[in-house]
A protein has these predicted regions:
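Hydrophobic alpha-helical segments and their helix-loop junctions in multi-pass secondary transporters
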Residues: 78-89, 117, 133-159, 217-218, ...
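Extracellular/periplasmic helix-loop-helix junctions in multi-pass membrane proteins
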Residues: 280-281, 294-313
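Membrane-interface interhelical connector segments
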Residues: 220-249
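Membrane-water interface regions at transmembrane-helix termini and the short interhelical loops
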Residues: 27-31, 61, 87-93, 109-131, ...
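Hydrophobic, membrane-embedded alpha-helices of multi-pass small-molecule transporters
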Residues: 5-25, 40-48, 73-77, 81, ...
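Helix-loop-helix connectors at the membrane interface of multi-pass transporters/channels
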Residues: 85-100, 188-209, 267-289
Length: 334
């Protein structure tokens, strides 16, 4: 197999780090512009289907996989309809039925996703392709609407003013990660089994995120007790505010959780799939981790300290996974 270059690792990081902001902006535009944003969503679904078709055909060529594009496209039509329906149902439920957005997402998005995942784990991985054209369209619409507002600080300000919706984007992050995995499959750099393992992890992490939001928003436990119960860093308790009608979360929490997910995914693909040597993977991960930590430290020193600790855990777990994979491969060769 070819090696993953530094640029490709950076692209994996960029996709995961950037997509939540694009989706957040697209949601804001959907509320402000209505029908135009709805048409853009439908267009994004068809663009995503074209991307999926090309990815499946390329995977056939590179991995000699007996893929069935027609089956994948049919499944993607269904998943596209589910996510688009969930977006509109969220708006209608909040307007007419007084239902919170998380209930609409849980009923119309999470339930069929879990069913499809348990029925055939590989089906759920292709849901994330829809997020790629959404990211492009969100930024293009924002730039055409008001070029002066296109700045990172305005995005951060909007995220803090709409913290509840921004926290709900954390449920989408695992699916965005699967989009990065699909890109690796497209390049022929990882075995399908590796991608399906990551897909299953993303599914379960999404379920636990939803469960965690319910527990924290109920206010039964305190912030620190809830964090311990969910095996989350105590630093998350500092930024959660219990007791308000809305569950408010600072933007920095999503930052370092997302980046940690990127690093673990990149390291897992590098070491477990055997696409690069162990030393080369270690150098790339350490370089990216330190660079990202420096950026986070500029904005928030407490988050930087916790993030540095999380990097150590991620690198250690990834290295152990790589060593176990190498030992198993050695036993099979003997």
């Amino acid at each position: 197999m070819n090696k993953l270059s530094s640029f490709e690792l950076f692209w994996l990081m960029f996709m995961l780090y950037d997509s939540p902001y694009a989706l957040m902006l697209l949601h804001y535009l959907a509320q402000a512009q209505g029908l135009l944003a709805a048409e853009m969503l439908i267009l994004a679904a068809f663009l995503g289907q074209a991307v999926l078709y090309m990815a499946v055909k390329r995977a056939e060529q590179n991995l000699q996989v007996n893929a069935k594009p027609n089956l994948f496209l049919k499944m993607y039509f269904y998943l596209s309809a589910v996510i688009i329906t969930a977006i509109f149902a969220e708006m209608l439920a909040a307007e007419f039925l007084n239902l919170t957005p998380k209930w609409a997402i849980a009923l119309l998005f999470l339930v069929p996703s879990v069913y499809l995942a348990f029925k055939n784990m590989r089906n759920i991985a292709y849901l994330s392709v829809l997020l790629l054209p959404l990211s492009l369209i969100g930024y293009v619409m924002l730039f055409l609407g008001n070029a002066e507002s296109f700045s990172l600080m305005n995005v951060l300000s909007f995220a803090q003013d709409n913290a509840r919706f921004f926290f709900s984007l954390a449920h989408i992050l695992p699916f965005v990660m699967q989009g990065a995995v699909l890109m690796v499959l497209y390049r022929g750099l990882a075995a399908p089994e590796c991608a399906f393992k990551v897909s299953s992890w993303a599914l379960w992490s999404n379920i636990f995120l939803l469960l965690g939001e319910y527990i924290l928003s109920c206010g039964v436990f305190g912030a620190e007790e809830s964090a311990r119960l969910l095996f989350l860093p105590i630093e998350l308790a500092r930024i959660l505010r219990i007791g308000d009608a809305l569950l408010r979360v600072e933007v920095f929490s999503v930052w370092h959780w997302t980046i940690a997910g990127v690093l673990s995914t990149a390291l897992f693909l590098d070491l477990a799939a055997g696409s690069v040597e162990k030393e080369a993977a270690r150098r790339k991960i350490i370089f990216l981790a330190l660079a990202l930590w420096l950026v986070v430290a500029i904005f928030d020193d407490v988050t930087a300290v916790n993030f540095l600790f999380e990097i150590g855990i991620v690198v250690s777990v990834g290295a152990m996974a790589g060593l176990i994979k190498q030992k198993r491969s050695g036993r099979r060769e003997k």
